[in-house]
């Protein structure tokens, strides 16, 4: 594998999310998020958002539909939006195979076509914070506008309190057969940006991408969400557990 990888062209790094969330992202999807973990996460979202059968629900940054389709199976009426045609194609195929009716839309979460349509919306598993602060706040305003009065918005993200303050990058490796996805993650403490330099070794070739996202603490989320039109903001830990400062996740649930 090494000899062939050296001969492959190394693309330039990119900060564009639609380059990062591509076929390689899809290929390693079930390794990073096994089906049993996705089942558990869908159950947690259902509970946190107080969903019932027939609830109209929007997922922003739905990817390949691993959560969207599961919630549709549970009886909610799902709409999924994503910027990646590759991931949406997989989401639609899986929905058809599972016999669920999901509306999948190619689009940008900073500009949504819906107003007062959904009972709930959510951004799950690091789908928030990929823009500058102004555009991140715009995403929250657009989400609020898409919700009916009393609607709920859920955001699942990294708990900024638990992010190591040292400068040395942290390495995460996912392996599928002989292929590897290697993430080197580092954090800019002063800006709150978390950078991911991703190395893909697949089919004997090497590809590199780069992306960063913004980490926010609970106080920042509360301020932005109230400014966007939400009346209350609650914090939870991973998959709806009690929030702790040293836990890995911060789950926000805001009510309009």
What are these language model-derived features?
Residues 2-63:
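Conserved class I S-adenosyl-L-methionine
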Residues 66-111:
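Class I SAM-dependent methyltransferase SAM/SAH-binding core
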Residues 110-120:
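A short acidic, Gly/Pro-enriched loop at the edge of an enzyme's catalytic core
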Residues 122-124:
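A conserved beta-strand element that flanks and buttresses the S-adenosyl-L-methionine
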Residues 134, 154-224:
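SAM-dependent methyltransferase
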Residues 137-149:
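A short glycine-rich, Lys/Arg-flanked "PGG" loop and its adjoining helix->strand segment in the class I
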Residues 218-256:
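C-terminal lobe and adjacent flexible extensions of AdoMet/dcAdoMet transferase-like proteins
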